[in-house]
């Protein structure tokens, strides 16, 4: 066979970005293309469970992440870079209980995992936190 007959049809792998927003009230998994401009898939804990109290649970995050990963893989994505975000600002700076479960579920669903980074907004002395002068008294 000649060189022209054997054209190497190596397809470029499609990678995306999984934006995981995890608070103590819900977990949102939003998969976009690599630029972040086009939404590929979006699921939240509230979309997969009935009870409001179950929205932030690791189980809900796991189901939502699996469904988001399946949708992304149907559209030809082979891997994702992960950006984890907590509420941040004057609110909680630590991600909720669903963040860890969502990352593991994405990997288990068959997507390759690239970089994992924390993009929680950190205030540089921004707005005053709620709770008044002496804080929340428990």
Curated annotation (Swiss-Prot):
The keyword rRNA-binding applies. Disulfide bonds: none annotated. One of its GO terms (molecular function) is structural constituent of ribosome. Residues 116-138 are annotated as: Disordered. GO terms for biological process: translation. The keyword rRNA-binding applies. PROSITE patterns: RIBOSOMAL_S11. GO terms for cellular component: ribonucleoprotein complex; ribosome. Keywords: Ribonucleoprotein, Ribosomal protein, RNA-binding, rRNA-binding. InterPro entries: Ribosomal_uS11 (IPR001971), Ribosomal_uS11_archaeal (IPR019961), Ribosomal_uS11_CS (IPR018102), Ribosomal_uS11_sf (IPR036967). Belongs to the universal ribosomal protein uS11 family. Located on the platform of the 30S subunit. Part of the 30S ribosomal subunit. This is Small ribosomal subunit protein uS11. The lineage of its organism: Archaea, Methanobacteriati, Methanobacteriota, Thermococci, Thermococcales. The gene is rps11.
């Amino acid at each position: 066979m000649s060189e022209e007959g054997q054209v190497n049809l190596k397809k470029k792998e499609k990678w995306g970005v999984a934006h995981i927003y995890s608070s103590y009230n819900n977990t949102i998994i939003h998969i976009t293309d690599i630029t972040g401009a086009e939404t590929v898939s979006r699921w939240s804990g509230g979309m997969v469970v009935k009870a409001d109290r179950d929205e932030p649970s690791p189980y809900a995050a796991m189901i939502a992440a699996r469904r988001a990963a399946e949708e992304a893989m149907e559209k030809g994505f082979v891997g994702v870079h992960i950006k984890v975000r907590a509420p941040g600002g004057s609110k909680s700076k630590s991600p909720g209980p669903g963040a860890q479960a969502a990352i593991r579920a994405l990997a288990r669903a068959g997507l390759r995992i690239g970089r994992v980074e924390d993009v929680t907004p950190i205030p540089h002395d921004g707005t005053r936190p709620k709770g008044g002068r002496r804080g929340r008294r428990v």
